């Protein structure tokens, strides 16, 4: 494989020395960029964009042409696994993702296949290989998946939800069915991420977008337990190099200690967690990624710079910080504000690495 020219991101995840704090943005390939909108229009619809390796590669690379980001992230969707299980994924305008055949009971769970990563999900692996080739070793490529709990919320609710009453009804009234579903998803995610690593992903991230809607006890049983299983089953080295794993539970700031016990290399923080506090609690064990409020990118560049300075000072001297937003970039953010953010991270962070 091509020699990596910029390995800051991978080094920071392993708490190794870097010259400046690495930075990337969740959803950095997305609708805030006019060139993304043009490519998506060319593809026809969102899943067609995901399933075309050349176009998925193009949108993955677009933000790297604009900004000196320290990592690329595979352009895909967290719902590829449920889609490959045959639930009939479609996108409703203004509604987000929906499934024609949601999971309602144990019998439905029993019928679900575990998708073969190089077969039903082969288009994702083709995209990974294409992106790695086109990156030419400039920066590392991040692969990802949704967490079992987060995937299950969409599969049981039939799409996006605000109150999560349908899946919580299953959790409390038929926990066995939900555990069977989560176990099947954990196996599927492990296979899927390992296939991404074999195809060329140099780091992987598990997005637990909806873990924060659970009580602490339920989070341990229904979300964290299954992420731990995945971490245990992942390839941790490929191509002679360690493959770091990041866990991110949105709304999970109160559970960082438990998350750090999974054996992951890094934890993603949302913007509601104080990064100085997080470092005191778990910084001896894991790297931290985050955690500027994505809405800060609406502010003037001088205000963005102040916020970057505050977060860098909060983390403090030394290694183990990847700068990011606390969640995905909003679609109506001015692209030049994202540029000011990335530039400020690199310029202001050098003083913390000497």
Curated annotation (Swiss-Prot):
Keywords: Cytoplasm, Decarboxylase, Lyase, Porphyrin biosynthesis. It is an enzyme of class 4 (lyase). Its main location: cytoplasm. GO terms for molecular function: uroporphyrinogen decarboxylase activity. It is found in: Cytoplasm. Its EC number is 4.1.1.37. GO terms for cellular component: cytosol. Substrate binds at residues 27-31, 77, 154, 209, 327. SUPFAM superfamilies: UROD/MetE-like (SSF51726). InterPro entries: UROD/MetE-like_sf, Uroporphyrinogen_deCO2ase_HemE, Uroporphyrinogen_deCOase. GO terms for biological process: protoporphyrinogen IX biosynthetic process from glutamate. The record marks 77 as: Transition state stabilizer. Pathway: Porphyrin-containing compound metabolism; protoporphyrin-IX biosynthesis; coproporphyrinogen-III from 5-aminolevulinate: step 4/4. It holds the Pfam family URO-D. It catalyses: uroporphyrinogen III + 4 H(+) = coproporphyrinogen III + 4 CO2. Homodimer. Belongs to the uroporphyrinogen decarboxylase family. Catalyzes the decarboxylation of four acetate groups of uroporphyrinogen-III to yield coproporphyrinogen-III. NCBIfam families: hemE. This is Uroporphyrinogen decarboxylase. It comes from Salmonella schwarzengrund (strain CVM19633). The gene is hemE.
């Amino acid at each position: 494989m091509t020699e990596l020219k910029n390995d800051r991101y991978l080094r920071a995840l392993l708490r190794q020395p870097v010259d400046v704090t690495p930075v990337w943005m969740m959803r950095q390939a997305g609708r805030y960029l006019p060139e993304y909108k043009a490519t998506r229009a060319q593809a026809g619809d969102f899943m067609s964009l995901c399933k075309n390796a050349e176009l998925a590669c193009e949108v993955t690379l677009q933000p790297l042409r604009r900004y000196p980001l320290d990592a690329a992230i595979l352009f895909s969707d967290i719902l590829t696994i449920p889609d490959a299980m045959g639930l009939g994924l479609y996108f409703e305008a203004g509604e987000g993702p929906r499934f024609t055949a949601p999971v309602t009971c144990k019998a439905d769970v029993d019928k679900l296949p575990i998708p073969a990563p190089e077969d039903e999900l082969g288009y994702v692996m083709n995209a990974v290989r294409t992106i790695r080739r086109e990156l030419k070793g400039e920066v590392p490529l991040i692969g990802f998946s949704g967490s079992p709990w987060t995937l299950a919320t969409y599969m049981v609710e039939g799409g996006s939800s605000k109150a999560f009453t349908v899946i919580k009804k299953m959790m409390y009234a038929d926990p066995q069915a939900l555990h069977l579903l989560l176990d099947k998803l954990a196996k599927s995610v492990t296979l899927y991420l390992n296939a991404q690593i074999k195809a060329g992903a140099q780091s992987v991230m598990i997005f637990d977008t909806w873990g924060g809607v659970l009580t602490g006890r339920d989070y341990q049983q229904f979300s964290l337990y299954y992420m731990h299983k995945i971490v245990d089953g992942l390839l941790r080295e490929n191509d002679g190099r360690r493959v770091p794993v990041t866990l991110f539970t949105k709304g999970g700031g109160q559970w960082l200690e438990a998350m750090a016990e999974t054996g992951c290399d890094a934890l993603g923080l949302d913007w509601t967690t104080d990064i100085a506090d997080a470092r005191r609690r778990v910084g001896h064990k894991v790297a931290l990624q985050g955690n500027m409020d994505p809405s800060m990118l609406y502010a003037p560049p001088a205000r963005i710079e102040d916020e970057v300075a505050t977060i860098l000072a909060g983390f403090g001297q030394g290694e183990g910080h990847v700068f990011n937003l606390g969640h995905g970039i909003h679609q109506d953010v001015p692209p030049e504000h994202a540029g000011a953010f990335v530039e400020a991270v690199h310029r202001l962070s050098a003083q913390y690495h000497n």
